[in-house]
Amino acid sequence: MARGGGKSGSLKDKLDGNELDLSLCGLSEVPVRELAALPKATVLDLSCNSLVSLPSDFCSLTHLVKLDLSKNRLQQLPVDFGRLVSLQHLDLLNNRLVTLPVSFAQLKLSLHHSPVEILSRLLGTPSSLLVFHSFHSWENQNLKWLDLKDNPLDPVLAKVAGDCLDEKQCKQAAVRVLQHMKVIQSEQDRERQRKLQAEREMEKKREAEQRAREAQERELRKREKAEEKERRRREYDAQRAAKQEMEKKTKKETVQTRKLASSSRPPQPARHKHSWSRSVLRALLLVLLCILCTLAVCKLTELQHQPLCVSVNTLYEDVVAAVQNHKTLQNMLQQNSQQ
């Protein structure tokens, strides 16, 4: 099979005014890049080729007004086929199409040829449900001619499309099919909105549940913290009470021990008095020793002529004389007492 993709120069050779005839060329692919370079070619005939599908970039050929894809092997149209908004005439005769993309509803149409009640009767849908797609919203829209004959269409779509045996039927087919696709698009939009709303509500519910859980967790932590604080306070009070009790017990035992110790030993004041007497006696002995040493120095050494020693010797002699007088007086008293 021949492949599309010849140079734009070779396509220009087939261009006749605004019509480009690529029928019966054995094409298995559409030369989209070369076609995009010929925006003047608003009428394109690709019939009687071996096309199985159309590339997604085919939808960029928005300058097309009339498109003939009849007698190929197309199994589906690109998802964005509705981007061909300038399209007024579309021939899809004798392909292998089962459904049409939802974007097909964007191909636009003019309702001057058929009222909404036609689709209402075909689909068994109350016309009030189709009022949303009003004449006002479509009055300047484009697609006017459509042929879907000899395709294994979905039964509902086949019933909507009907026959295309003459100009009038093909125009009515365009109206009916686009209305049908508009309804499907609206239903999908509503379903999408419903799912989106459900997801939002579910998200809000999850957020509310999360906030509730967080609030419960905060309350639980707060309660646990308060309980822990109360437990520690009780432990502190218990330890403090035990410490005070131990101090009281220790103090009591100390008092009792002191009482027992004081009752089992002699009184301390006499002991202190005896020690004081010894200290006084030692002091007196030390003074007496000093006096004797001084007398010895003043009597036996060359210092006896010094003024200090002279005074000491004089005092010594006076004391000795006084003692002797005292002994004489004492002897006299003893004698008198014996008589």
From Swiss-Prot:
SUPFAM superfamilies (UniProt xref): L domain-like
Gene Ontology CC: endoplasmic reticulum membrane; nuclear envelope
Residue ranges of the region described as Disordered: 186-275
Topological domain ranges for the Lumenal compartment: 301-339
LRR repeats: 10-31, 40-61, 63-84, 86-107
Record localization: Microsome membrane; Endoplasmic reticulum membrane; Nucleus envelope
Residues annotated as transmembrane: 283-300
Keywords annotated in UniProt: Coiled coil, Endoplasmic reticulum, Leucine-rich repeat, Membrane, Microsome, Nucleus, Repeat, Signal-anchor, Transmembrane, Transmembrane helix
Cytoplasmic side: 1-282
Coiled-coil intervals: 181-254
Biased composition (Basic and acidic residues): 187-256
Membrane-protein topology: Single-pass type II membrane protein
Listed PANTHER family: LEUCINE-RICH REPEAT-CONTAINING PROTEIN 18-LIKE, PTHR48051
Subunit structure: Interacts with SGO1.
Function, in words: Required for nuclear import of FGF1.
Protein name, per record: Leucine-rich repeat-containing protein 59
Native source species: Gallus gallus
